[in-house]
Amino acid sequence: SLRTRLVVWRVAAALLITVSSISIYLALQNRQAPDLLQAYIPTAETRNITLPDGTQVLINSQSTLLYPQQFTGDTRCVYLVGEANFKVKPDKKHPFIVKSDDFQVTALGTEFNVSAYPENQESSTALLSGSVLVEWGNLTQRTVLQPDEQLTYDKENRQFRVVHPDMADVTAWQRGELV
């Protein structure tokens, strides 16, 4: 009868939706996130590392850099707690992104310094060459830095400002100097 066939079709459709949903869920559960590597630099040390894309990173003491074993997808993203200098290998199709608690820095091929120690009142990004896009405030505010500019964020006042520091002071730690 027509009613019996209609019930059979409804049951078949419900089973198809259920099986499809379970299959999609299981496929997503089995998808592996890229393996993350951690570079922790103890007190009174610095370390040079080369990321999988060829980007050179000099990491300051008491800093941690998290990065994937292999960059995949549309961007090359790392997470920094502390301070590091990045000499980014150019790749216009895959922007290089450094994330910290306070802001995100996007570069295509440039050299810049990020200082984002959680215990410090200020975090900053200083541009040595090229250009970078710095975003903050849940990525709703942004500015593009030019060479020899530094964006500084005061965590207590939640204020950002762009200054023109002495770059020798900004990079003194890379030469083992204290400022």
What are these language model-derived features?
Residues 2-179:
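A residue-level detector for the "anchor" residue at the start of short, highly conserved motifs
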